[in-house]
Amino acid sequence: MLAFPELSENCIIIDSESKRYSMCGVRIGCLITRSKKIHDAAMLFAQARLSPVLLGQIAATAAHQNDGAYIRAVREEYTHRRNILVDLLNAIPGVICPKPRGAFYCVAELPVDDTEKFAQWLLEKYALNKETIMVAPAGGFYSDPELGKKQVRIAYVLKEEDLKRSVEILKNALKKYREEFSL
């Protein structure tokens, strides 16, 4: 933001402890902007909120007093999970999954007619050894839902073994779905 003064009125940076340190529910973060309009609007909310809960403040302080080892370990773990998930997904016939570079989820194109329909079928009609999976149809993440009609968003927040099992379930589900609906 500082490097591009011509964009300063149109730039907003938002960060939060809940995202940076996986502190679900901790409502501590920051908003950085040079826009007076955005700043004034944010201050209305900030002043109404007063302050975050004490335990959240203590946890956030502790998180900032580390040497970076925690962040490195988390980054390494998510990179490992991402690589496993992307490799396993791309090994399924008809699945295309680019490697994401900055998130903890991937968007994969599936060999189905409609991922909304497929996701519902997974939850209501499919099980492999009494297990199923849930995927998020990607259409809702696009301004034009048709762009994501054959895509799903899959988070890689599970442990490695659970990720592997989930992909095995997906692989079998895709085969059965394509047979059932003659795709």
Annotated model-derived regions:
Residues 1-183:
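PLP-dependent class I/II
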